[in-house]
Amino acid sequence: MYHSLSETRHPLQPEEQEVGIDPLSSYSNKSGGDSNKNGRRTSSTLDSEGTFNSYRKEWEELFVNNNYLATIRQKGINGQLRSSRFRSICWKLFLCVLPQDKSQWISRIEELRAWYSNIKEIHITNPRKVVGQQDLMINNPLSQDEGSLWNKFFQDKELRSMIEQDVKRTFPEMQFFQQENVRKILTDVLFCYARENEQLLYKQGMHELLAPIVFVLHCDHQAFLHASESAQPSEEMKTVLNPEYLEHDAYAVFSQLMETAEPWFSTFEHDGQKGKETLMTPIPFARPQDLGPTIAIVTKVNQIQDHLLKKHDIELYMHLNRLEIAPQIYGLRWVRLLFGREFPLQDLLVVWDALFADGLSLGLVDYIFVAMLLYIRDALISSNYQTCLGLLMHYPFIGDVHSLILKALFLRDPKRNPRPVTYQFHPNLDYYKARGADLMNKSRTNAKGAPLNINKVSNSLINFGRKLISPAMAPGSAGGPVPGGNSSSSSSVVIPTRTSAEAPSHHLQQQQQQQRLMKSESMPVQLNKGLSSKNISSSPSVESLPGGREFTGSPPSSATKKDSFFSNISRSRSHSKTMGRKESEEELEAQISFLQGQLNDLDAMCKYCAKVMDTHLVNIQDVILQENLEKEDQILVSLAGLKQIKDILKGSLRFNQSQLEAEENEQITIADNHYCSSGQGQGRGQGQSVQMSGAIKQASSETPGCTDRGNSDDFILISKDDDGSSARGSFSGQAQPLRTLRSTSGKSQAPVCSPLVFSDPLMGPASASSSNPSSSPDDDSSKDSGFTIVSPLDI
């Protein structure tokens, strides 16, 4: 025990007594302690008052204005209710539990709470309390009468046990839902709803819709209790946020939510569809999901994938169809639980804020469904069946769930909602591949039922082989049938006829065959699938028997017969060797699919850029033609180069890798005798020139010497065809080489030698004398040709 220097203690004095303490110091400490306590009280009072002030301020911001409902709806869609202390009230307003008129809130709340109290009193009964007032011939524990309270009590007990079984599994990672009072609230609310809706009763998954509602109500009640410690809240707050009526308020919100979600839990078919099915024959080549019962939830998820997903991402839609992943596999849980298992609870509440704020019909569910698929689309497209199933059944974590809501809003109405920032998903596909494999293994084990003993299977296969081979052997014996026996007796005679030296070797061989069978995993599968009929026949041919066509009358030994049977089984061992090869092929196919998706994106981008460039180039071209500019010709030449780029992006003009190399080593050569040496002017005076200025607007003049402007700055396109074909006048698609020549009206079109000639470095000197026909991207031609440009200002 530590003592300060101011204290003195007698060795024989007990530790409980304290002596030698200065009374002044104790007084000062006491007075200082009192002052500290007063300071703490003052600070705590200020903190509590500040808490209530902020609480009341938030109440006024949300509910004290004329258009408060639109305000809280916008906050719910924008994700601004995440930290709100009045989220439960907002949900009640979104789901029409509370009226928009605030003056009716108290009366409406009291009415709903009295309604639930009456329901609970009717359905949750104890027959022991009312047994004295009823006929004991009917109301006894052994009575099976429908009007018996005891019979009803046992039926209710069975229903409650089923509900409690699901309630115990509700959010097991959260301590709040493991409390007994919370579990009792969940059970009572679900039981009362089931008894009030006998046509639907209780369906698995309803507890996961009720649990977030109870959690939000509890959080708001705790915030109310904390804020009301320092100040007196209003009567409106006291009534709406009374913690004693948490169960009553939860039932009111849950029952209103189920008004919309009830068809998703119903297993009844549509009445209108039943009449159609009696008249319609099954659809040929229909998918399995289209041939099932027309349940509302199945119709909904099929419509989401077949219409919405197909509209927004046809590639992902085709990939899921190719893998035969029906939307019912994952979509039923997504829609029924309102994505309750796909997000953490705090993110789930943000999603529900947007769903409820959007409207009571929950129309945003369909687009959140599609947005979730688009979020992981790259991972899905590049994955096989197992990995896709793992991704869909165990949805990956999303860092910003609000971006998913914005994506859904954009998909529904892109005109009113801006395009959200692309939020990419970088998955660990190995994890989801393992999860998908686990799901497949679980489904297989559930379908198989009890596991089989491999020893029993091997023994049964051995006996099965004996029965198959032995009856076919007896009729072929040389000595005819055995006297006094049939085929079955002959098999019994053949088996024991072994020498003493033959028995141990056969026993060892039999053990080896059993071990080989145990290692062969595919044999039972082949037998189940009916593939064994290819290898095993009930009436084997002569070639399949030992010895082939040289079969003699002496029957073979038992070991030889078993070898003929197990030789077919041993072939299945090669099946396991090909599994690794198939896995590598699947991974390669996944990579090819992913690269194909990227190529499609690049192709779409190039086409879009070409389309936009074409539009802007035409506009620039029209403006230039209307203005008289000094360097108009240079601008037009630059436009022609841009149009070549546009045609390359569009795909109508072929792009060669040599062009990149030529650009790196680009050199401009000048030849004074270019036109004379190239021979381009020989025999091409007629029908081979097109005016550039006329070709920009239209092919109005095909006469070689005619020009629209008639000056020395006109551009003339000389075609390199030998057949004298007329030039095409659409400048918007012009991609063939250009030549600028000086032309005068009324004169021959013989080319004029220029002192300044630019030779194309891409084509080389041989391009001038080439006779290859020119290409036009409008004709989808992809041939390349050289060109020479002469500036009209330098001529």
Swiss-Prot record:
A motif (LIR 1) lies at residues 57-62. Residues 484-496, 765-776 have a biased composition (Low complexity). It is found in: Endosome membrane; Cytoplasmic vesicle, Autophagosome. GO terms for biological process: autophagy; macroautophagy; positive regulation of receptor internalization; protein transport; response to starvation; retrograde transport, endosome to Golgi. Residues 786-791 are annotated as: Required for interaction with ATG8 family proteins. Changing W59A: Disrupts interaction with VPS29. One of its GO terms (molecular function) is AP-2 adaptor complex binding. One of its GO terms (cellular component) is autophagosome. Keywords: Autophagy, Cytoplasmic vesicle, Endosome, GTPase activation, Membrane, Phosphoprotein, Protein transport, Transport. The modification Phosphothreonine is found at T42. The modification Phosphoserine is found at S43, S44, S460, S522, S539, S541, S544, S554, S570, S584, S730, S791. It holds the Pfam family RabGAP-TBC. Residues 25-49, 523-542, 554-564, 727-748 have a biased composition (Polar residues). The record marks R169 as: Arginine finger. Residues 1-49, 475-564, 674-795 are annotated as: Disordered. InterPro entries: Rab-GAP-TBC_dom, Rab-GAP_TBC_sf. A motif (LIR 2) lies at residues 785-789. Residues 1-13 have a biased composition (Basic and acidic residues). PANTHER family: TBC1 DOMAIN FAMILY MEMBER 5 (PTHR22957:SF337), TBC1 DOMAIN FAMILY MEMBER GTPASE-ACTIVATING PROTEIN (PTHR22957). Interacts with MAP1LC3A, MAP1LC3B, MAP1LC3C, GABARAP, GABARAPL1, GABARAPL2. Interacts with VPS29 and VPS35; indicative for an association with retromer CSC subcomplex. MAP1LC3A and VPS29 compete for binding to TBC1D5. Interacts with AP2M1; indicative for an association with the AP2 complex. Interacts with ULK1 and ATG13 (phosphorylated); indicative for an association with the activated ULK1-ATG13-FIP200 complex. Interacts with ATG9A; the interactions seems to be restricted to the AP2-clathrin-associated fraction of ATG9A. May act as a GTPase-activating protein (GAP) for Rab family protein(s). May act as a GAP for RAB7A. Can displace RAB7A and retromer CSC subcomplex from the endosomal membrane to the cytosol; at least retromer displacement seems to require its catalytic activity. Required for retrograde transport of cargo proteins from endosomes to the trans-Golgi network (TGN); the function seems to require its catalytic activity. Involved in regulation of autophagy. The arginine and glutamine fingers are critical for the GTPase-activating mechanism, they pull out Rab's 'switch 2' glutamine and insert in Rab's active site. The LIR (LC3-interacting region) motif mediates the interaction with ATG8 family proteins. LIR 1 is also implicated in interaction with retromer; LIR 2 is only implicated in interaction with ATG8 family proteins. This is TBC1 domain family member 5. It comes from Homo sapiens. The gene is TBC1D5.
